[in-house]
Amino acid sequence: MCLQVGEFVKQFYIVDSRMDLPCYCINLDDRPERWEETKAAFEGTDIVPKRFPGIRHTEGWKGCGASHVAIAREAMRRGLPWVLVLEDDCDPVADFTARWPTVKEALWAERDSWDIFLGGPTFIQGPAEPLGPLTRIEGAYALHFYVLRASAYEKALAWNPDRHGPIDVYYSDQFRIVITQPMLAVQRRSISDNEEEEVDYGYLFRRSEHVMQQLLYSARTREGTIGLLVFSAVLLCLMWFRKRR
């Protein structure tokens, strides 16, 4: 009996441990204040980020991309089924703590349907396909908060800046993307290593929320129309059979 209970506990622990979501936050060595801000931003959530030293490059976007690829390489080395990646200007939205557990559970349940989850997407490309609290889309940018599955690691490592351009563009082209609406995270106003100046992307996130709403409305309207057509077809068949009797 003890052995059976022990095996049950062992099996339960294995399943539960696979659902654990390790988190890395990319942070350059000369930006300790940004690391502290990000840690503080996620206090009170179930996310405990581990600092990942960012890679410095004379062209900021190349160093940014190399840092993201390095995390994919580390996740592959560790055999992680998935990994959460933050950039050090990431801020969770006000209701993050209430919504994140549901989104995380849905991501695990639907894990065979996606390669990357973007928590704060910009420049969203439809059409959209609702999957419960998730939505599958054709493309989007922004990597300040995302979950990468093991299915994407090899392609992530194949990124070449001279051939593929910015890392978020490459990921958008290569991976099956899911998002959630409203979004879970934005970027706070700060100095951008890519832009080499202080930037405020608030307008992009507001625009993206609007685009997501439109895409979801179109998808649900389309589903409703299809459902109505199917219902009408079934009704016509029933009427035809009744006349034949």
Predicted regions located by residue number:
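An acidic/histidine-cluster motif and surrounding catalytic segment
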Residues: 2-86, 90-245
